[in-house]
């Protein structure tokens, strides 16, 4: 085992990396509320894992979406559990994100020199809301359909470009197959990639600047 370790150590200097990770100073004022960001990340990882599992059975078409979800819930082994965990972790992710934002705001974690960390956090909050909006409509039941119709219709109130935004979101004038395809692509590919990039940036800045001081 030591020879394997030495082989990697010689090429990657893994001991220096391990020392840097484990020797980071943690201020004495840090308490359990400073873990809310990490809990949100954990919920996101659970979302990715369970969401990936569901893609094997979900069919993003207006004629088969609901039936595929029903099949997952009733016929697939532990399918009901996978979807339930996905839904529960989504709710927990939103709740912990809100609490995390409140903690950062109340402790002044957004102040200089951590303004950019705050900006990436706000962008992550927007992405999280977008996850909820796009995922809610994927079963394509009555609730999902009308939620999709209402949400995509909101930009219509924007002067001049409102109608164009609505058509881009829906893939046409009305809600249909193109809308579901857009929501599915955004929920399973675009948003996860954007979230991962923002999270990496967020964590790198936290690692560089450290945790903010007490009030």
From Swiss-Prot:
Component of the cytochrome b6-f complex, which mediates electron transfer between photosystem II (PSII) and photosystem I (PSI), cyclic electron flow around PSI, and state transitions. It comes from Emiliania huxleyi. GO terms for cellular component: chloroplast thylakoid membrane. HAMAP family: Cytb6_f_cytb6 (MF_00633). The 4 large subunits of the cytochrome b6-f complex are cytochrome b6, subunit IV (17 kDa polypeptide, PetD), cytochrome f and the Rieske protein, while the 4 small subunits are PetG, PetL, PetM and PetN. The complex functions as a dimer. Heme b 1 binds at residues 100, 202. The lineage of its organism: Eukaryota, Haptista, Haptophyta, Prymnesiophyceae, Isochrysidales. Heme 1 (or BH or b566) is high-potential and absorbs at about 566 nm, and heme 2 (or BL or b562) is low-potential and absorbs at about 562 nm. Pfam families: Cytochrome_B (PF00033). Its main location: plastid. This is Cytochrome b6.
């Amino acid at each position: 085992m030591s020879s394997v370790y030495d082989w990697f150590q010689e090429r990657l200097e893994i001991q220096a990396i391990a020392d840097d990770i484990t020797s980071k100073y943690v201020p004495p004022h840090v308490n359990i509320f400073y873990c809310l960001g990490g809990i949100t990340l954990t919920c996101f990882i659970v979302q990715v894992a369970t969401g990936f599992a569901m893609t094997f059975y979900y069919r993003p078409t207006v004629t088969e979406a609901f039936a595929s979800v029903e099949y997952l819930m009733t016929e697939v082994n532990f399918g009901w559990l996978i979807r339930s965990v996905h839904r529960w972790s989504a709710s927990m992710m939103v709740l912990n994100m809100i609490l995390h934002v409140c903690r950062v705001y109340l402790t002044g974690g957004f102040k200089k020199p951590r303004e950019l960390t705050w900006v990436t956090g706000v962008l992550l909050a927007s992405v999280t809301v977008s996850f909820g909006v796009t995922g809610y409509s994927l079963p394509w039941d009555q609730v999902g359909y009308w939620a999709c119709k209402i949400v995509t219709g909101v930009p219509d109130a924007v002067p001049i470009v409102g109608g164009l935004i609505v058509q881009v979101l829906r893939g046409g004038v009305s809600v249909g197959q193109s809308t579901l395809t857009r929501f599915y692509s955004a929920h399973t590919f675009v948003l996860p990639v954007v979230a991962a990039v923002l999270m990496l940036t967020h964590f790198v800045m936290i690692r560089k600047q450290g945790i903010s001081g007490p009030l």
